[in-house]
């Protein structure tokens, strides 16, 4: 497809006319153009298009201001909230095992300190003690009734009643209760209505045997008999005195688990009003619904219509929510729980309302007692002390529910068939909760209805709505999950996994996802209750959406994460087959499956067989590796998860206590392991740090199991020169073997195995030899020549001599060589974390690295500091494999080389800079680690680096999943403000009349760069200029305030070399892209891309991502002229240099998506990506040619021409301002600037002879008709697009008019008439226009 055809849809709405690219009818000319070395080579070109614009429409603004955003996912946000450890779990659950009821009533005899009114309260446990004769009968009935009232709250406890006891009776009762309860709680209930009030010392009263005396009982004795844990209920006057006595006892000793409930304060007596029962406190604690309704009825307008006796006959059962009595109890529980939740500290709420069922019931009822008894001038007291709750507004909701209930009572008894009408209480409270969800947040008061939501979950009628609302709440963040778990939803959602209701499955999976994202310890409960079966069935269901099945896979991954019982249970439930079945099915899906689902299938498998040999064997037998390799997609999360699963499929060695010969691995398993390592090596240079991290972790596992032989392979390169000559290929041989272009993504092309090469056995395993060695894998390998056989024999003998006795298990030498090369590649990774991991992997096989301090550069790129003198200085390794592939990587071998070189041999031999290999003796103090050839040990295994993909992926489910649009409103508003600013200034730039730039800079910045400014850029929306020097020092300067905002080093490697700076996502929180080209070593250079956030804030810069961008280079490439440009509209980064292609990186996918080859012996020296036409790119070459590419066309190349007369490299290249897709400005080092219309490329339509040679920089304004060129002869010239010279800049504004240095870089502000110029000196100058006249 031609260029014009591809651009029609994009530009059809603008004033630019675009037609198909058929300028020539001469097919021969067109056909031969691609290989023509003449001045002009054309593939296609459209007719001339108009480039006049009257205004910027909304459509054209889309081209000028692309909406594409990259690198803004969770993986790039290191500033995620630190999740605090969950606090919801109780330290321990308690149970009340025994209840002691002590009744001191002595009916018919009033205590001496009580003066009763008439009439007065008489009922005890709703029985009139004077209604029976003899009094003992009434006493027994009251005791029995109290026991029954308590049994409604806790039926399984043991109840013991003592009626009018003596002190010895109480002692025996207490001792027997403690003996029975053991470590469980004991409840001691004391009714002292028939004895005097407690003494000031806190003594309660009992009787002597003849009831002739009151005997004091100190609470200290009571406490010594009952011990702890206990709960006391004192229903007597002045009961707080007893609490004070307990408090004094606790203050003198360690704190005890002791809870006390007292009926009234120190100077208060129990109410005697006839509207209350005599034991009003006990009635509130044990029969709350009855007394609450009677108390409310007397204060309600319904009292004239309701017979109070009907309350005693309310139909239904207390534990049946579908009856009137059951619903009232349900509402009462919800109300009191809500009051407690909203007024108590969380820890106290959990202790009193969630730790013990009986204690929770008593404290709910205690809140009612406070409300009712305060109306009788009594204040119930508790320990721990509770704040006042009698006026809480939730009591109004209870009163309303009670009133609705009472209003129905007469009809129930008039017509027994009357249908029960449920209360609207829960519906209304759920609506209130929903309103909070619409407007609440973490920073507002928590929803008070949360305990009510828990209560609703217990019943089917509102369960679905409650679960949906609960899911919305949990989605607000980990704080919400912790809050919900603290209120007590956990047992309920565990129990709901036993339901088979289909409509609840999806929301339950969502809720469990949120719970496990906060607290993985729930895995134990899920396995114990067989909850994993529920989620495996859901995962295997066909009616669930992929996103929901991804959540199920996440839940199962958490269940098996580090929990052996979970792994065993899921393996028994056939989880491997379920996951692999989905992976197989997704390979045939069109459209592609949900990436999150694929990601968590891989992570679930990886966690299932991590350090679990039985699962690893089953995974290998099921060909899991093939499915995982096929799962490598364009999405980096899936790639990283697949690499993680492949890595954990590798067995790292034996568990402690297992012998060397416990297990055998057959040839098929060897082949699987071989396939896994090859697939890992294929992605060792992946564009995503997340993927490369997993590769490093997986290689560490592989190295741990094969460290003896990996170390031997590395040692083979540490031989004296006479050994190297026989075991290493020459440099010429290496380059002649077809490896002149090194493709790191295909590690197989790096080395070659001889057909006769001997396989090396894996450490610690016994297996038969592989009869057919792998071939075609190692090209240029040090073991690939005729001496490879001898080298292998030496390796095997070395293994035996070091005490590892085993029969050889075949593993191709190529794998070991490629793996060691991959480890060195990772140790030089642009990401500091991955480089550190790479060094740790090397340490596993016995190689330590010495961090070399970079020496001060003298300003001449390519010079490296000489290494410090060592005993091995001068060893010849010019043809060493390390030199060819590792670059300047300081190393140390932690074990001696195979053949230590002699001192005489080392004299006078050449050294390789920055690379130090130092032999360490076994067990030497500075070796740092145990020798890797020793047996597998826990201490060594603990050194293996840990994966990050799993924990990082779990963070996804901690974030809001159901919405989040509101959170982006502020970002959208800022973007719109920037967009408006941009469009206004674009219009000004396009329609301005520019007379030139002032020779006097508006700002002069001394960067203090020792090597001069290499590149600079101007921030589009802030008065900021960013500059960098050859040593990759980056500095950010505010030119309005003349202040340095930040300065940092791009990397810590000794080899430096900056190439370019670009801004990514400039309409949002922009990122700084830094392209650096390190000094090469013999065969390859490192061209690294690093992208920084918060680069303008001092000390806050953070590396978002980093990768090596050039995947292949020419033989002998210096790598110093690598070029890069960024295209926001497509999200593509274009990179080239001394290679045979232009690399196209998708930054959002962090993946190399295309490689555009060019048939030329010249290197690319300039790149310019169109900022208004996505996927379009112009490239300038070292021979002066210019080519136009479009990544959407099959052949990429659209047009090629050679506009410059002299064969000099293209220094600068840019598309002209505006929407025209074919007009380009090209500047040659010879000094001429050519204006091209690539639709008519036979000749340039305008030429400017700007400089007589030595043109060094070109700047083209993105929107204004102005360009600037710089020269090594210390001047800058400014031109219009018509070729008119608008000005010359020669001098800095300073005393004596100091001349500027040789110009190294020029950068225009994208939306203002502002030019930044950097020179070989340390100054960066900013120039603006004389005046701008807008058209009227």
Curated annotation (Swiss-Prot):
WD repeats: 1008-1047, 1053-1102, 1116-1155, 1159-1199, 1205-1246, 1250-1289, 1298-1336
Pfam families cross-referenced by the UniProt entry: Raptor_N
Function statement: Probable component of the plant TOR kinase pathway.
Protein origin, superkingdom: Eukaryota
Tissues where this protein is expressed: Expressed at low levels in roots, leaves, flowers and seeds.
Biased composition (Polar residues): 746-757
Keywords, ordered alphabetically: Repeat, WD repeat
Start and end residues of each stretch annotated as Disordered: 746-766
Family the entry assigns: Belongs to the WD repeat RAPTOR family.
One Gene Ontology CC term in the entry: Cul4-RING E3 ubiquitin ligase complex
Name by which UniProt lists this protein: Regulatory-associated protein of TOR 2
BP terms from Gene Ontology: maintenance of shoot apical meristem identity; TOR signaling
Gene: RAPTOR2
InterPro entries: ARM-like, ARM-type_fold, Raptor, Raptor_N, WD40/YVTN_repeat-like_dom_sf, WD40_repeat_dom_sf, WD40_rpt
Disruption phenotype: No visible phenotype under normal growth condition.
PANTHER family linked: REGULATORY-ASSOCIATED PROTEIN OF MTOR
Record's keyword annotation contains Repeat: yes
């Amino acid at each position: 497809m031609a260029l014009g055809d591809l651009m029609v849809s994009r530009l059809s709405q603008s004033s630019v006319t675009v037609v198909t690219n058929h300028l020539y009818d001469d097919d021969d000319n067109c056909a031969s153009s691609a290989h023509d070395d003449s001045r002009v080579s054309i593939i296609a070109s459209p007719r001339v298009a108009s480039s006049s614009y009257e205004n910027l429409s909304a459509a054209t603004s889309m081209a000028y201001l692309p909406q594409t955003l990259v690198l803004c996912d969770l993986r790039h946000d290191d500033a995620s909230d630190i999740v605090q450890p969950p606090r919801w779990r109780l330290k321990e659950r308690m149970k009340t095992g025994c209840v002691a009821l002590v009744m001191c009533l002595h009916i018919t005899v009033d205590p001496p300190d009580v003066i009763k009114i008439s009439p007065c309260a008489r009922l005890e446990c709703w029985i009139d003690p004077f209604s029976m004769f003899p009094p003992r009968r009434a006493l027994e009935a009251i005791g029995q009734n109290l026991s029954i009232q308590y049994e409604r709250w806790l039926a399984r406890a043991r109840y013991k009643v003592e009626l009018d006891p003596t002190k010895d009776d109480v002692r025996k009762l207490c001792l027997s209760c403690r003996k029975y309860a053991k470590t469980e709680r004991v409840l001691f209930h004391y009714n002292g209505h028939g004895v005097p009030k407690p003494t000031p010392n806190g003594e309660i009263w009992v009787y002597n045997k003849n009831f002739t005396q009151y005997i004091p009982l100190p609470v200290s004795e009571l406490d010594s008999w009952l011990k702890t844990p206990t709960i006391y209920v004192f229903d007597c006057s002045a009961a707080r005195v007893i609490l004070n006595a307990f408090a004094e006892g606790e203050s003198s000793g360690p704190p005890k688990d002791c809870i006390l409930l007292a009926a009234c304060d120190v100077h208060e007596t129990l109410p005697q009003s006839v509207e209350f029962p005599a034991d009003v406190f006990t009635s509130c604690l044990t029969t709350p619904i009855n007394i609450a309704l009677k108390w409310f009825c007397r204060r309600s307008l319904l009292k004239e219509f309701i017979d109070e006796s009907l309350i005693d006959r309310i139909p239904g059962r207390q534990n049946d929510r579908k009856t009137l009595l059951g619903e009232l109890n349900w509402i009462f529980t919800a109300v009191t729980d809500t009051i407690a939740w909203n007024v108590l500290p969380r820890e106290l709420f959990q202790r009193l309302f969630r730790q013990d069922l009986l204690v929770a019931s008593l404290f709910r009822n205690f809140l009612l007692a406070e409300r009712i008894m305060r109306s009788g001038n009594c204040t119930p007291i508790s320990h721990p002390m509770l704040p006042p709750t009698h006026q809480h507004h939730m009591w109004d909701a209870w009163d309303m529910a009670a009133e609705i209930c009472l209003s129905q009572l007469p009809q129930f008894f008039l017509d027994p068939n009357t249908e029960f009408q449920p209360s609207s209480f829960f519906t209304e409270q759920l609506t209130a909760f929903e309103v909070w969800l619409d407007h609440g947040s973490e920073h507002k008061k928590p929803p008070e209805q949360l305990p009510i939501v828990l209560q609703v979950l217990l019943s089917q009628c509102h369960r679905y709505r409650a679960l949906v609302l609960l899911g919305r709440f949990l989605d607000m963040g980990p704080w919400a999950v912790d809050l919900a778990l603290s209120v007590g939803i956990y047992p309920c959602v565990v129990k709901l996994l036993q339901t088979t209701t289909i409509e609840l499955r999806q929301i339950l999976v969502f809720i469990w996802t949120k719970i496990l994202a906060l607290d993985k310890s729930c895995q134990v409960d899920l396995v114990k209750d067989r909850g994993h079966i529920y989620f495996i069935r859901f995962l295997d269901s066909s009616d669930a959406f992929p996103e929901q099945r991804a959540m199920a896979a996440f839940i199962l991954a958490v269940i098996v994460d580090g929990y052996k019982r979970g792994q065993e249970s899921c393996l028994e439930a056939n989880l491997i087959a379920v996951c692999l079945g989905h992976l197989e099915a997704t390979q045939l899906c069109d459209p592609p499956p949900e990436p999150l689902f694929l990601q968590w299938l891989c992570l679930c498998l990886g966690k299932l067989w991590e350090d679990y040999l039985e699962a690893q064997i089953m995974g290998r037998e099921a060909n899991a590796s093939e499915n995982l390799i096929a799962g490598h997609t364009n999405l980096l999360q899936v790639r990283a998860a697949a690499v993680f699963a492949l890595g954990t499929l590798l067995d790292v060695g034996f568990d402690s206590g297992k012998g060397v010969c416990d297990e055998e691995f057959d040839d098929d398993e060897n082949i699987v392991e071989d396939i896994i390592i090859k697939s890992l090596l294929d992605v060792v240079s992946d564009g995503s740090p997340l993927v490369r991290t997993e590769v490093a972790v997986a290689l560490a596992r592989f190295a741990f199991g094969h460290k003896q032989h990996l170390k031997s392979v590395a040692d083979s390169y540490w031989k004296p020169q006479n050994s190297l000559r026989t075991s290493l290929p020459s440099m010429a041989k290496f380059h002649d073997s077809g490896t002149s272009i090194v493709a790191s993504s295909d590690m197989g092309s790096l080395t070659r195995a001889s057909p006769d090469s001997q396989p090396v056995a894996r450490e610690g395993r016994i297996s038969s030899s592989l009869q057919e060695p792998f071939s075609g894998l190692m090209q240029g390998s040090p073991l690939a020549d005729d001496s490879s056989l001898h080298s292998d024999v030496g390796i095997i003998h070395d293994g035996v001599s070091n005490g590892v006795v085993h029969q050889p298990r075949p593993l191709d030498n190529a794998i070991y060589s490629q793996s060691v090369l991959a480890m060195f590649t990772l140790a030089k990774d642009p990401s500091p974390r991955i480089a550190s991991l790479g060094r740790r992997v090397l340490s596993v096989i016995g190689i330590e690295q010495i961090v070399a301090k970079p020496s001060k550069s003298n300003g001449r790129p390519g010079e490296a500091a000489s290494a410090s003198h060592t005993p091995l200085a001068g060893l010849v390794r010019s043809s060493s494999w390390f030199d060819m592939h590792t670059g300047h990587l300081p190393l140390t071998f932690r074990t001696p080389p195979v053949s230590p070189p002699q001192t005489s041999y080392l004299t006078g031999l050449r050294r390789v800079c920055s690379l130090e290999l130092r032999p360490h003796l076994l067990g030497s103090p500075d070796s740092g680690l145990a020798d890797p050839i020793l047996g597998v040990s826990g201490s060594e295994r603990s050194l293996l680096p840990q994966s990050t993909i799993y924990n990082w992926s779990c963070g996804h489910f901690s974030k809001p999943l159901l919405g989040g649009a509101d959170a982006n409103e502020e970002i959208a508003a800022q973007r719109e403000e920037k967009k408006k600013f941009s469009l206004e200034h674009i219009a000004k730039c396009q329609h301005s009349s520019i007379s030139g730039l002032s020779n006097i800079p508006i700002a002069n910045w001394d960067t203090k760069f020792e090597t001069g400014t290499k590149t600079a850029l101007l921030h589009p929306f802030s008065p900021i200029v960013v500059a960098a020097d050859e040593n990759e020092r980056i500095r950010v300067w505010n030119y309005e305030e003349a202040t340095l905002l930040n300065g940092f080093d791009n990397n810590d490697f000794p080899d430096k070399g900056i190439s370019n700076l670009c801004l990514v996502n400039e309409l949002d929180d922009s990122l700084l892209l830094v392209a650096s080209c390190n000094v090469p070593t013999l065969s390859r250079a490192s061209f690294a891309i690093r992208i920084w956030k918060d680069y303008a804030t001092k000390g806050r810069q953070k590396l978002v991502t980093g990768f090596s961008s050039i995947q292949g280079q020419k033989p002998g490439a210096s790598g110093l002229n690598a070029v890069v440009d960024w295209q926001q509209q497509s999200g593509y980064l274009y990179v080239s240099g001394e290679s045979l292609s232009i690399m196209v990186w998708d930054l959002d996918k962090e993946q190399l998506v295309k490689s555009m080859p060019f048939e030329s012996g010249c290197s690319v020296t300039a790149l310019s990506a169109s900022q208004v036409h996505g996927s379009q790119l112009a490239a300038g070459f070292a021979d002066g040619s210019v080519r136009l590419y479009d990544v959407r066309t099959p052949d990429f190349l659209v047009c090629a021409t050679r506009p410059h007369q002299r064969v000099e490299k293209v220094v600068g290249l840019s598309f002209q301002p505006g929407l025209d897709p074919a007009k380009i400005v090209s500047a040659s080092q010879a000094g001429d600037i050519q204006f091209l219309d690539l639709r008519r490329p036979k000749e340039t339509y305008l030429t400017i002879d700007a400089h007589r040679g030595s043109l060094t920089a070109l700047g083209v304004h993105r929107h204004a008709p102005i360009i600037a060129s710089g020269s090594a002869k210390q001047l800058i010239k400014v031109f219009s697009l018509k070729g008119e010279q608008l000005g010359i800049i020669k001098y800095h504004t300073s005393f004596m008019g100091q001349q500027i240095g040789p110009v190294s870089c020029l950068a225009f502000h994208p939306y203002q008439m502002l030019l930044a110029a950097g020179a070989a000196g340390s100054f960066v100058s900013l120039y603006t226009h004389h005046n701008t006249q807008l058209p009227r």
